[in-house]
Amino acid sequence: MVRYAATSANPAKSASARGSYLRVSYKNTRETAQAISGWKLERAQKYLDQVLDHQRAIPFRRFNSSIGRTGQGKEFGVTKARWPAKSVNFIKDLLRNGQANAESKGLDASKLKVSHIQVNQAPKQRRRTYRAHGRINAYQSSPCHIELILTEENEAVEKADDSKKVRLNVRQRGRLATQKRVTAA
């Protein structure tokens, strides 16, 4: 079994999925993963479908130099956003795989949440491109590893009655006790 960067608090209530050496842009995939981190599974899948249809965009926060601006980024408080289709498809496949793993464990798919998603750089794949005057330049791709953990959310527990309790110090408790004794006598 491979080691994940994060461990879930309750392994019986979580399912994981991972992809290694995936031939998809590391930077785009990292931004896509950050966009859905902590979301419910159904919401994340719906959002990624909307990104593919260009109805919503992925906000680019870290790797955003030379990226055009779009109004669809306002939803996330950014101006720079894109629609990285290849990254979205890879993450959608992993979410589907994680959901299948969760259902095989007997977990409820409607309660699943993306509790951990991480994108790491894989070794670059090297090629070469031929330039003018007999020069040769590197032509590298930046693949990545993706891992995610889906966790079944616990039922919400109602808050206890928040009535104000009177807190007394030792001297006040002693005075109160003597007053009770006096009134009882």
Curated annotation (Swiss-Prot):
Family annotation (InterPro entries): Ribosomal_uL22 (IPR001063), Ribosomal_uL22_CS (IPR018260), Ribosomal_uL22_euk/arc (IPR005721), Ribosomal_uL22_sf (IPR036394)
GO biological process: cytoplasmic translation
Keyword terms, alphabetized: Ribonucleoprotein, Ribosomal protein
GO MF: structural constituent of ribosome
Residues forming coiled coils: none
GO cellular component terms given for this protein: cytosolic large ribosomal subunit
Family, per entry: Belongs to the universal ribosomal protein uL22 family.
Protein name per its UniProtKB record: Large ribosomal subunit protein uL22
